[in-house]
Amino acid sequence: DIIPMGFGFTDEERVKPVELEKNGIKVALFNSVFLRLENWIQTDGEPGICMAKGNELAARISSYKQKHPDTKIIAVVHWGVEFMPYPSHQQQMDAMLLASAGTDVIVGHHPHIVQPVKKIQNCTVIYSLGNFVFDQKREDGNKAKMAKVTFRKNETEVILYDIDIVKCRPEVSRK
């Protein structure tokens, strides 16, 4: 089953995390778009996406973490500057806010190319996974990462796999 996240009819529904539990480990997934989207207008009473900015999302995560201290938290964020190979100043500031709020893993996307992975406090920040299925003419747009996140009681493991986009299809890199 695919569980929608970062979606709803009200701001409250949109910012609410998806909660999962497996083998006694609880995980909350938050999803937000930090950028203004082309051709997208949020309309009252209509379904929409979470557009909480970094400070708003960090406040929500902090509040959630206080109520659920043993729950692991993943924030999936649409942020950054297209085709920039390193995180923008704003991404770095937002990552610090989210890490300080108690986020365990941040998974970023939007730049269309891979950006670095960094550890901030106890949070693994994947600034951009790159493209996964996307028709790009640029060489750097045909590379991506796939993240495998494993939570244990006192440990978070993040493994990144290199992905090549071949004819718009992702393939695990053989290199």
Where are these regions (language model features)?
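Acidic, metal/ion-coordinating pockets
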Residues: 1-175
